[in-house]
């Protein structure tokens, strides 16, 4: 949601412009590609070609009982590096879906009378967008995000298999 909200607001506020077309077309592509294909592409390009993170496999470092309470101990950075690709590959299709949903709701809300009234009162565009437009538009976004938690767990099963992460599958 951290990436979907700004992208959706910008795309809706700049509707019909080049920015909107770039965001919408990019999101259409990312929402059409399954998460396991994104996982394989990310593992190949970021893991193998660039070598930034380990492409496959999950071997967490050994942790003693004394180290568990510390975020810096027990290889927290190593865990983070190992989880970047699975998290990104699971979140890209959801970001695309949430952004498109928010964009549609914001465009509909921007055409409401109370938004015109807020603009005629002299409120700034930023205040109108965040207080008068985002709040009513975010209801469906957060409802959809809550309902997609089950699909996220189902998608995690495939991603765990691809990256050899011990978990559900």
Regions found by a protein language model. Name each.
Residues 25-28, 32:
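Residue-level signal for discrete positions within transmembrane alpha-helices
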């Amino acid at each position: 949601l951290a990436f979907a909200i700004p992208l959706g607001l910008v795309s809706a506020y700049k509707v019909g412009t080049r920015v909107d077309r770039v965001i919408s077309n990019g999101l259409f592509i990312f929402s059409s590609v399954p998460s396991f294909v994104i996982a394989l592409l990310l593992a190949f390009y970021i893991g193998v070609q660039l070598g930034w993170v380990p492409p496959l496999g999950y071997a967490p470092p050994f942790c003693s009982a004394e180290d568990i309470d510390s975020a810096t101990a027990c290889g927290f950075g190593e865990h983070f590096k190992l989880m970047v690709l699975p998290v990104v590959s699971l979140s890209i299709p959801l970001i695309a879906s949430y952004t498109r949903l928010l964009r549609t709701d914001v465009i509909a809300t921007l055409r409401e009378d109370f938004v015109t009234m807020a603009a005629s009162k002299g409120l700034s565009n930023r205040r109108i967008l965040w207080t008068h437009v985002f709040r009513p538009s975010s209801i469906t976004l957060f409802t959809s995000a809550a309902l997609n938690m089950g699909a996220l767990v189902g998608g995690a099963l495939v991603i765990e298999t691809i990256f050899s992460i011990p978990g559900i599958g």
